[in-house]
Structure formats: structure tokens, C-alpha cells
Amino acid sequence: MKYQLTALEARVIGCLLEKQVTTPEQYPLSVNGVVTACNQKTNREPVMNLSESEVQEQLDNLVKRHYLRTVSGFGNRVTKYEQRFCNSEFGDLKLSAAEVALITTLLLRGAQTPGELRSRAARMYEFSDMAEVESTLEQLANREDGPFVVRLAREPGKRESRYMHLFSGEVEDQPAVTDMSNAVDGDLQARVEALEIEVAELKPRLDSLLAHLGD
């Protein structure tokens, strides 16, 4: 497979794909915007604390590999970045909105079950039911230009198998280390995380509104 992203490159591309859909008014992103998105505490696994120089290095590498491009509009002195990873004018990788949502969520959080993916990808694409999630995953696993995802062996005590993207190479199919989060139902945890994301994004808007009313 021609895609071989490092963990940091996958995080950067995942962030740009996410923000392109969820906050189009702020897209393309500046370096600071990418840093904030990469270090976001919600909908990220693992949570990172990348410096601006670390992010800039990843951006430069991805531009050289033609996965990103710089944008500098008239009167705009700040360089911004947009993704060319998929659905770009001259790119080979074409994905549906449902496929973009699933791949983005896998890039940002690693291996997940279909139920977790449906909840966590909801802000990018609203799946009608679990059957649509599973059929989209199967399409990604069986594409002629892929595969782009793989189904992992079901972990002991789990009802669903997890899926992982293949943009960083082959995946070692090993059970995850047991931790406290395994005691929580995956679907419920994903719903709570989705709500936390919405609250985190609504708070700045509320603060701005309150400040405006106070003037």
C-alpha cells in the first residue's frame, strides 16, 4: 500500500479532515490551528501535547509528499494548510462522506468498534443505522485501490470486533491492554465523548455571546 503515515502525520491529516467538515468557517487551518486541533483533549486517542515546531515539521513533510498544500490568500499574511489527502482535484483517493467520517475517526482515535465509530463520527456524517456503518467499513476493506481498513480479531468479553485503518501500514492484531475504560460499554462511552466535544465547542461561542451582551 502506498500510504505510510507516521502516528504524527496521521494525527495532522485526521485533524484537517475533521475541521474541514465540522468547522468549515475556520478552514484551512493556520499552524496554531493545527497545533490546537492535534492537542485537543476530546475525540483524540492518545491525547498529545505537540509543540508548534513539531507540528510544523509534520506539515512541511506532508506538503512535500503532496498530502497537504499551503494557502495564502490576498491580504492574508498567515500561511494556512488544507488537505489533499483525499477528494482533491487531481488526487487518486476519492472517498464518500461516510468513508471520510470513518477514516478520520480511525486516524484520530485508532482501532474502534462499529458502534464507537458511529457515535464518534456523528458530527461528520450521520449514519442511518449500524448496517450502514458496517457496510461502509466492508467497502473500505474491499476496495480495489485499498484495502484501507481491516477488521481485528474480537477481544475476549467484547461483543464487537474493532476496525483499524491501514494508512500507517499493517496492523498487529493484538488485544489491547486492559484498563478501566474497558469496564464501560463502548457505545455509551462514545456517546458521552461525543457530547463532551459538543460542549467544548459551544463554550467559546457562549462566552463570546455573554461578552457581547455585557458591552
From Swiss-Prot:
The keyword DNA-binding does not apply. Signal peptide: none annotated. The modification N6-acetyllysine is found at residue 80. Keywords: Acetylation. Coiled coil: none annotated. Belongs to the UPF0502 family. This is UPF0502 protein YceH. It comes from Shigella boydii serotype 18 (strain CDC 3083-94 / BS512). The gene is yceH.
